[in-house]
Amino acid sequence: MPRAAPPALLLPLLGLAAAAAADCPSSTWVQFQDSCYIFLQEAIKVESIEDVRNQCTNHGADMISIHNEEENAFILDTLKKQWKDPADILLGMFFDTDDASFKWFDNSNMTFNKWSDQEDDEELVDTCAFLHTKTGDWKKGNCEVSSVEGTLCKAAIPYEKKYLSDNRILISALVIASTVILTVLGAVVWFLYKRSLDSGFTTVFSAAHQSPYNDDCVLVVAEENEYDIQFN
């Protein structure tokens, strides 16, 4: 039987799982779903939340926005495992006095919240939102902070890049699959060809060493020759 395709041919498949990671700007970013995250681990002095936001925009991102429980949990887990674990993270959120609601700086919809139990009648002008890293709850606080321990930024993966990445993975998978199939077929054909050659060589070799007469024929011929000699 032909041997299976060498494992080395399958090694490129291992790279497909990591292909999506290349969608983030660099290895210092962490990807989750359709976004990339980076925690700028440096304390900075600020006069307003815009100073914090500028830290993110300088990296082509914006302050963090959170849209579901899974993302909230991911941020908490990553803060503990990979980043310094500050007590609170400033969220990219502001209070819009025009319609008396909180909004994200990145203009995404407010589809999720994790507010801790607080009084609803508190003054919300100049109020910012913070993620408490120990509990995962959000809490309101004064935007006039003098410093922050670090800035958490988020950048969405562009649609074009995601689309190209998905197609690149599909094309790579098809190419690798085709290569493996052709390799296996080639191995089968080569095996059958070698077996055919070996079989033909054995047949010729056997025929070359086979006498055209058996023992009985040789004995009869010898007796006839002896009889002819006696009567001549």
Swiss-Prot record:
GO terms for biological process: phagocytosis. It is a single-pass type I membrane protein. SUPFAM superfamilies: C-type lectin-like. CDD domains: CLECT (cd00037). Residues 1-22 form the signal peptide. Disulfide bonds join C128-C143. Glycans are attached at N109. One of its GO terms (molecular function) is signaling receptor activity. Residues 32-152 form the C-type lectin domain. Residues 23-168 are extracellular. It is found in: Membrane; Cell projection, Filopodium; Cytoplasm, Cell cortex; Cell projection, Microvillus. Keywords: Cell projection, Cytoplasm, Disulfide bond, Glycoprotein, Lectin, Membrane, Receptor, Signal, Transmembrane, Transmembrane helix. Residues 190-232 are cytoplasmic. The chain crosses the membrane at residues 169-189. One of its GO terms (cellular component) is cell cortex. Potential multifunctional C-type lectin receptor that may play roles in endocytosis and phagocytosis as well as in cell adhesion and migration. This is CD302 antigen. It comes from Bos taurus. The gene is CD302.
